[in-house]
Amino acid sequence: MAHFPGFGQSLLFGYPVYVFGDCVQGDWCPISGGLCSARLHRHALLATCPEHQITWDPIDGRVIGSALQFLIPRLPSFPTQRTSKTLKVLTPPTTHTTPNIPPSFLQAMRKYSPFRNGYMEPTLGQHLPTLSFPDPGLRPQNLYTLWGGSVVCMYLYQLSPPITWPLLPHVIFDHPDQLGAFLTNVPYKRMEELLYKISLTTGALIILPEDCLPTTLFQPARAPVTLTAWQSGLLPFHSTLTTPGLIWAFTDGTPMISGPCPKDGRPSLVLQSSSFIFHKFQTKAYHPSFLLSHGLIQYSSFHNLHLLFEEYTNIPISLLFNEKEADDTDHEPQVSPGGLEPPSEKHFRETEV
């Protein structure tokens, strides 16, 4: 898993931030209220303090007695956790427990797929720009998971206490067999624990494949998954995008939509933006962290994330691309009269974004 150095405190609560699955040499001890030990560490979604012999859950701050109680929800055990500063951290926002999913959303999920040769390439992270952050408190970790013929993004920013919960969608599609981009080979047990915590804390509706985690402790919704593979290496370009996903808000109010690749040879797991980006970088595909580091989107704008439902399925091409690039004929494999083959998988891997 990727490890991003320079861990810092959160911009909102002064709370430490984490990257899912990594070991962080520093955390707040619930007893002392500070960094009481240099040996303090976090691993496998747990944090321990060797000086005070205490173990707690860094995601929601709940103190636990042993790893066996990891999935048991409980109130904070120490008065130091109930201060005015930590109370805001330990209190998740209210969410809808039973969000309504329009049938059109589930139907639209089957339209496009970022499969390459029948499976998700684990090297898709190489196609994205280098992660750069203006502040150490913002550490996005995106779980790109495939659902049927489409990609669904679980935007799990930091996975550190509840400053992340407003950023989570109310409906989470998770296919543990098809994790890609930044996180790969996540153990089923860890994913189950994470989804269970999200379900408890936020009330989000977890949707899993019918044959995934059959003995899970919580009761997720089940939905069939039909896997289909694209013959070409990348998603085709379309003049009118019909892509379920998330809508972001730029600092100037223009939208940024997650969708398939804009041009042949460009990465598919990126975010497409409006004309606001063209004036800055003459491009349409950049990772949210890159846009964040250049001041194009704000941290507060992440709270405007919402699921892309029926009213957003048809997006005019003028909102996303320049007129000269509004060409939907370049997604077909181009074979010259000499019989040359189209670009191979190695070509895509070496293409600069």
Swiss-Prot record:
Family of the protein in this entry: Belongs to the deltaretrovirus Tax protein family.
Which additional comment does the entry carry? HTLV-1 lineages are divided in four clades, A (Cosmopolitan), B (Central African group), C (Melanesian group) and D (New Central African group).
UniProt function note: Transcriptional activator that governs the viral transcription from the 5'LTR via the recruitment of dimers of host phosphorylated CREB1. Together they bind cAMP response elements within the viral promoter and mediate high-level viral transcription. Increases host CREB1 O-GlcNAcylation to further increase 5'LTR transactivation. Also modulates the expression of cellular genes leading to the deregulation of T-cell proliferation, perturbing the integrity of cell cycle checkpoints, the DNA damage response and apopototic pathways.
The name on file for this protein is: Protein Tax-1
Membrane-spanning residues where? none
Positions carrying Phosphothreonine are T48, T184, T215
Give the primary localization class: host cell
A GO MF annotation of the entry reads: SH3 domain binding
Region named Interaction with CREBBP/P300: 81-95
Q: What ranges does the record give for the region Interaction with CREB1, renumbered to this chain?
A: 2-58
Please give the residue ranges the record annotates as the region Homodimerization. 116-145, 213-248
Task: Summarize the subunit comment.
Answer: Homodimer. Interacts with host CREB1. Interacts with host DLG1, IKBKG, KDM4A, MAGII3 and TAX1BP1. Recruits the coactivators CREBBP, EP300 and PCAF. Interaction with human CARM1 enhances Tax transactivation and promotes methylation of histone H3. Interacts with host SUV39H1 protein, leading to abrogate Tax transactivation of HTLV-1 LTR. Interaction with human CREB coactivators, CRTC1/TORC1, CRTC2/TORC2 and CRTC3/TORC3 enhances Tax transactivation. Interacts with host UPF1; this interaction inhibits the host nonsense-mediated mRNA decay (NMD).
> Regarding domains, what does the record say?
The 48 N-terminal residues contain a non-canonical functional nuclear localization signal (NLS). The PDZ-binding domain mediates binding to human DLG1 and MAGI3. Interaction with other PDZ domain-containing protein induces IL2-independent growth.
Composition bias, kind Basic and acidic residues: at what positions?
A: 343-353
Q: How is it modified after translation?
A: Phosphorylation at Thr-48 results in the loss of NF-kappa-B activation function. Phosphorylation at Thr-215 results in loss of CREB and NF-B responsive promoters activation. Phosphorylation at Thr-184 and Ser-336 have no effect on these Tax functions. Phosphorylation of either Ser-300 or Ser-301 is necessary for localization to nuclear bodies. Thr-48, Thr-184, Thr-215 and Ser-336 are highly phosphorylated, whereas Ser-300 or Ser-301 are only rarely phosphorylated.
What GO biological process, any one, is recorded here? symbiont-mediated perturbation of host exit from mitosis
Transactivation: annotated segments: 289-322
The record's section on InterPro entries has: Tax (IPR004120)
Query: Organism classification, top ranks?
Result: Viruses, Riboviria, Pararnavirae, Artverviricota, Revtraviricetes
Q: Which organism is it from?
A: Human T-cell leukemia virus 1 (isolate Zaire EL subtype B)
What residue spans carry the region label Interaction with IKBKG? 106-111
